[in-house]
Structures are given as C-alpha cells and as structure tokens.
C-alpha cells in the first residue's frame, strides 16, 4: 500500500469514528469564575460651562483629561493598576480620532492604557461606567476609569461630500449639533417634540413643568451656596491671550429670571398647544466627568477614607419607541432594582437626568416616586446637560450625597428611545 493510500485509509477510519460516535471530547472541567463585586473609589467632574461660555476653546477630550486626572488622584489607585478607560462622547465631528484615547493621553496616563469611546447619546457616560463595571465583575481587570465628556460649543457645521457641490453659488450647511445631538432621526423632529408627546400622554401641565424648572434652579442655587458640590468639582484652567483663568463653578444656574418663566413661548410646538419651553428644558453645555472603578481587593487596599466609596449593586438598559425616549428610565429602573435585590422604597436619593421637566414628572409618576428625594441639588435644567458627560455627572453628584449604607439610583434617558439605570450603595469600608 502506498503512502497516499495509507493516508486515505487513516482519514476514512477517522471519519468512520465520528459517524460511529467514537469522537473524543476533553474531560477537563470547564474553568469557571464567580462574578466579583465592582466598586467606585472616586468621582470628579469639571464645572459645567454655558454654551459658548468659558470652555469655548477647550476640546471635549481636554475636559475629559481634567476629570480623569482628578478622579485618579482622588482614588489613590496607582496608575499602573488601570488597564482601560471608557469615555462617553456624542458629538465627535471635528474632535479628532479616538476621543477617549485623546483624553487618556492628555491626562498624562501611560500610553499603554487602552481607551474606548462610547456613544449612547445622553446615556453615554453612565453606559461607560457599566461597561467598566462588567470588566471588573468578570475578573478581566482590577481597576478602570469611566466617564464622559462633551463640548457642544465646538460642534461644527456639516457639508456632505455627496452633496454635489456646485462650481459656484450658495452651499447649504447642516448644524452638527442639531443633526447628531438634538434630532429624532426616525420622525425628523427635535427631542423637544418627543417631550411634548410625553406631556400629552401623561397629562402634564405647563404649570407643573415650569414649577419643576423653578425648583431645579432654586435647588442648584442653594447647593452652590451650601458648597454641596465642592468635593466633586475639578477646576479647569483656561488659557487665553489675557492669561489663565480658573473655572471652578457651574455657569448656568444663576442666569434665570423666575418671573419670566411662565410667559416664555413654547420652543417646539407653536400651534397654541405646546408647553415645552427653553426654561423647562435642559441647556446646551460643555463639561466632563470621570470615576475610578475597582475590584474588591482594590477597594480594600485603596478605598479607605474615600468620600464616595460605593458598591455597584445592579444596572440595566431598556428601550422604547424613539418618540417615547423620555419615559425609557421607567423601564430601566425596575430591572436595575431587581438585579440589585432591593425595592424603590430602599432608595435614599434618585438622580434622573433633567433633559426636560416632563422627563422627571412622567417617570416619577410612572414609578410612584412622588415625595421621594429626586434631584435634590438641581439637575440638567439648572446645572447643564453636556451630552456625553451627563450620565456620569449625575452618578458623580449622587455619590457625593449618599451616606454610608444608603442606596442611590442614577437613571438617564437617551435619544433613539432608550435609557440606562444604575444602583449603588455607599459603604464606609470593604
């Protein structure tokens, strides 16, 4: 028998063994790891600047770098323990390649640290935190950084390469901020129109929205007066021809005339039935926030004395029809609570993103949170809504309010019809 014939015979015998069930499988037991607990060791945020305000010349990644650097310093975690950074960033036109990577390098972190940019619209920053938490829970990393960043003031206007530009004459441009940040792609109208739909579906009045907005501003003003944000703020040094200016305070909460709010015209529906105005909606802003997450071992070693040390108890995403995005948190929150093993009555403080006053009013109504501590220090209406940062910003603010033992929930809706929610418990030590 030739060599070729021997090989063929061996192959036939092998195939026959498969057919007759003689195939051999490994008897080694599968490797299994128990899910680990993930903790938050520190959280920091830049002030939130007004649209075309103090951060006009500071890119989103550079704002992110300030937040990352501050959070890392507060955490006491050695930088060599950090393996990955996740940063939310929504409006990436003209920001440059890999915004999260830029933030890592601008923060002075080692170039060996991997970075990933997350775009889940307004929920980007909170989604970034859940992704980092998953890596730690699965034992893939000891420590990670997560957060978000946005500079809405720097978003460019667009001219499509496929527009067939004329040799001469006028050229039509699109506002990148409206197109990629503020418009429902499917119905082709503003996010505010979705809020108007929520108002009608849940019988929310103009007066209720205005009252909520006024309370948001008053809460924010009192919070700043009481220095409630002092521990979470990472000042930003802005350079200009006149020298350097240190920005250490949110810019929008003072700019309100309460007597004018009830008389403002609706901003989105102008047929006489609209109720959503510039005052009872969030503002356009620039800012960043970041948190350091670690395993139980990291929390035990470096978490002592942390102002915000907390265990991540559960989190969830949920989706709705795009037009119903304002009430998506009401779907995500119950799932997150169930995964955390607690009920809503055990939650001490709730932080919902105030995209619109109607978002808080509708979700509070659906979830039965009337009378609960919701956004006690103000929210996106008064403090600002820097899209990619907002999810991690509300979590940062939540953590600085909780006392050891207390549970808190951060929840945020996002364009396209979805939301992310996260449950934490403050702990004194691990």
Swiss-Prot record:
Subunit composition and interactions: Homotetramer.
PROSITE patterns reported in the protein's UniProt record: THIOLASE_1, THIOLASE_3
The enzyme's E.C. designation: 2.3.1.9
Binding site for K(+): 217, 278
Transit peptide: 1-32
Binding site for CoA: 260, 282
Catalytic activity reported: 2 acetyl-CoA = acetoacetyl-CoA + CoA
SUPFAM superfamilies according to UniProt: Thiolase-like
Domain of life: Eukaryota
Keywords: Acyltransferase, Metal-binding, Mitochondrion, Potassium, Transferase, Transit peptide
PANTHER family per UniProt: ACETYL-COA ACETYLTRANSFERASE, MITOCHONDRIAL, ACETYL-COA C-ACYLTRANSFERASE
Entry's localization field: Mitochondrion
GO cellular component: mitochondrion
Function: Mitochondrial acetyl-CoA acetyltransferase that catalyzes both the formation and degradation of acetoacetyl-CoA. Seems not to be involved in ergosterol biosynthesis. Plays an important role in growth, morphogenesis and maintaining mitochondrial function including the response to oxidative stresses.
Swiss-Prot/TrEMBL cofactor(s): K(+)
Source organism per UniProt: Gibberella zeae (strain ATCC MYA-4620 / CBS 123657 / FGSC 9075 / NRRL 31084 / PH-1) (Wheat head blight fungus)
Catalytic machinery residues: 122, 385, 413
InterPro entries membership: Thiolase, Thiolase-like, Thiolase_acyl_enz_int_AS, Thiolase_AS, Thiolase_C, Thiolase_N
GO molecular function: acetyl-CoA C-acetyltransferase activity; metal ion binding
CDD domains found in the cross-reference section: thiolase
Biological process according to GO: fatty acid beta-oxidation
Protein name: Acetyl-CoA acetyltransferase FG05087, mitochondrial
Enzyme class at the top of the EC tree: transferase
Homology family: Belongs to the thiolase-like superfamily. Thiolase family.
Sequence positions that bind chloride: 414
